[in-house]
Structure formats: C-alpha cells, structure tokens
Amino acid sequence: MTSTINKPLDGEGSVQVKQDPKINIEEGALVIAVYGKGGIGKSTTSSNLSAAFSKLGKKVLQIGCDPKHDSTFTLTHKMVPTVIDILEEVDFHSEELRPNDFMFEGFNGVMCVESGGPPAGTGCGGYVTGQTVKLLKEHHLLEDTDVVIFDVLGDVVCGGFAAPLQHANYCLIVTANDFDSIFAMNRIVSAIKAKAKNYKVRLGGVVANRSKDTDQIDKFNERTGLKTMAHFKDVDAIRRSRLKKCTIFEMEPTEDVIEVQNEYLSLAKNMLENVEPLEGNPLKDREIFDLLGFD
C-alpha cells in the first residue's frame, strides 16, 4: 500500500508564524529586512542606512527585532522602551496607547521602534514582530512612510524570526570576509529562497562589513548568484560612532568618515533606484567548506 505525502504549506507542520493577511505594510513603501551572523554589525548597518535614506529626503521607519532592543540607540541616542514592554503595561489593550508611547524620533527624523521579544526560552519573536506591525497599522503610522527597515536578530532563520521576510521587498545580508559569516549567510539565502515561494521578498544583495578584502565573499557570490551592494572596511570611525551613541553622519567629517558616509548614501540610492532582485542558490554545507579558503 502506498500513500502520497503532500508538501506542507508555508507555516504548516512547524512552529513558523503564518502571516495574518490583514497585517501588511502599504504598497509603495520600500521594505528591507537586514540579516546576518550575530555580532556582524547589522544594527550599525541598519541605523546608518536609515540615516542615509533620511539624508535623501525619505521618511524612514526602523524596526528593531531583537529582545536586546539595541537596534536604534545610535539614532535616538538612548535605549527606548520596547513594544512588548509597553503592551504589557496596558495588559495588551493597544487601543490605550498613543504613538509616542512606542515610536521615537531619531536622527534627521528617522522614526524608531523596538519590538523587543519574549523572555529567553519562551514565546516567539515572530509573533512580537507581527504585533508591532499590527500596532503601527492601527495607528496609521505606515501610511506616509517611504522606507521601512527591519533589523533582525542574529542569523536565526526559524519561522519566528523569518517573519520580517513576509513583509519585506528585499533582504540585505551583512557579512564579513570570513568562513563563519559566509556560512551563516548561506543559511539565510536558503530561508529567503523558501519564503520567496509564497511572499514578495527577494534578495537585494550583500553588504560586506568590517573587511579589508572581499575575495571570499566574491567566491560565494559567484557560485550562488549574489551581488555585493556595499563594502565597508574595518574603519575605526564606525566603532567610535557606536561608542558615541550616534550615526556615522554625526561624526566629525574626516576623510574616513566621509568615505563611509558616501558608501551608505550610494547603497541607499541603489536600493531606491537600481536594485536588481537576485535568485540566490544556496550551497550545501560541504560545498561551502570546499569553496572557501586559500588555494
């Protein structure tokens, strides 16, 4: 006797978070999800990219999707309360909240929200992200937004933290020119390829970060069909900007700082005008092991 096993739909047979069809970000906004290995500089990249978009005259919203809620502090110059903390204070009666309870204005008018997350080992971060978008929609805070950036926790690609991919047009992957970062990037490419079957999200490209060279990234890109959209070398001014709790656009305009600022502005312009949706083809783990390294 034989039986047929049907392929599960998105979110079936797992702990994935299904997207509520009523929770969508308005058409017309450019929505970018930023992923990458933990500690690779996603929040720095996201915040400086948000600042760059604002410099181009765009209305920008950055949503931090990490329980550490440290995505936006270089924009706001402080640690802001999270959506989940604010909702708990009103017993999750969102109608009692005002926009300034959970959304904070940062550098050059960038609006900042930290979704936060459940305590470690409990709940689902993807649910929190969905509730954050729902709250923003209830208060009509997405209607006039030009660019939305999701800054996502580490390299977790479970259904929960893949939730921003359900809203995004493009995903940018931040990586360094090393094995561990590229290995994590490959896993993220796999997640995006899976989500792209059911949602509009596509790969926007790679951001090379904290790397003098990009030879290993270039090898991976050539094999998988990816493209480097920006390259940020290991510039001390970027590290110092984090310590000063500000964006790179607020630093003293030295030659290094201006070079980094121009690279962020170029990335923002390309995401607005010249981004080409990429069809990434992830490698098997053994293939990455054999590909990377010195000949």
Curated annotation (Swiss-Prot):
Record bears the keyword Nucleotide-binding: yes
Binding site for ATP: G39, I40, G41, K42, S43, T44, K68, N209, R210
InterPro entries membership: NifH/chlL_CS, NifH/frxC, P-loop_NTPase, Protochlorophyllide_ATP-bd
GO molecular function: 4 iron, 4 sulfur cluster binding; ATP binding; metal ion binding; oxidoreductase activity, acting on iron-sulfur proteins as donors; oxidoreductase activity, acting on the CH-CH group of donors, iron-sulfur protein as acceptor
Cofactor note: Binds 1 [4Fe-4S] cluster per dimer.
Reaction catalysed by this enzyme: chlorophyllide a + oxidized 2[4Fe-4S]-[ferredoxin] + 2 ADP + 2 phosphate = protochlorophyllide a + reduced 2[4Fe-4S]-[ferredoxin] + 2 ATP + 2 H2O
SUPFAM superfamilies: P-loop containing nucleoside triphosphate hydrolases
Pathway info: Porphyrin-containing compound metabolism; chlorophyll biosynthesis (light-independent)
EC number: 1.3.7.7
Protein role: Component of the dark-operative protochlorophyllide reductase (DPOR) that uses Mg-ATP and reduced ferredoxin to reduce ring D of protochlorophyllide (Pchlide) to form chlorophyllide a (Chlide). This reaction is light-independent. The L component serves as a unique electron donor to the NB-component of the complex, and binds Mg-ATP.
Assembly and binders: Homodimer. Protochlorophyllide reductase is composed of three subunits; ChlL, ChlN and ChlB.
Designated name of the protein: Light-independent protochlorophyllide reductase iron-sulfur ATP-binding protein
Species per Swiss-Prot/TrEMBL record: Prochlorococcus marinus (strain MIT 9215)
